[in-house]
Amino acid sequence: MEYKIEKQAKGTRILFGDEVRDRYTLLNKMIATVESYGFQGIQLPSIEPSEIYIDKAGKEVLNQMWVFPDKKARNVCLRPEATATVQLIANHFWQAKKEIRVWYFEKCWRYEKPQRGRYREFWQFGCEVINPSTDLIKEELIDISKELCELQTKDITIDYSVTRGLGYYTDKGFELRCKQLGAQEQICGGGAYDRGIGFAIGFDRLMLCK
């Protein structure tokens, strides 16, 4: 069930009861799946220095970021996506490590025009592989992302060569789509970046698929 209250911020959602139960049921299945492939969970900050995304995010994301000064007049933002933060962590802690596999389930924020499947406050489930040990990692991640999405729906198509809208990607990426969602059919996107590769699933959109 979804509630609406007076003066609720546009593009946010209040969920209750069966809806919340179903979300956690799917989430727990997704976590069990990726951990069977050697991924470990990571939790990330929701508030970041906005400069993290200036060079890494594409123009569309930059225009949608929630940016504001903190009490010391430093520009910070609500996280618009998670991969850029994982990249920074990798550069600080995992440079000399062998392959590292992480998963995350994080709330993100973008100032978009709200509609079905597109919210200003939304959840992403993602997987990142740092220092991949095989040239076949992209194919493996596509298979894993498909397996995750098929926990909810079999109505999945894959585009194996997509130009992604984030500045840190170094090659063609991939997308998974659910046609029944219409204009908001993309439910997963991923690709390679410096020293890593990963994908993120729009969890709220995936929940709309049947």
Each language-model region and where it sits:
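TRNA-recognition modules of translation machinery and tRNA-sensing kinases, especially anticodon-binding
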Residues: 1-210
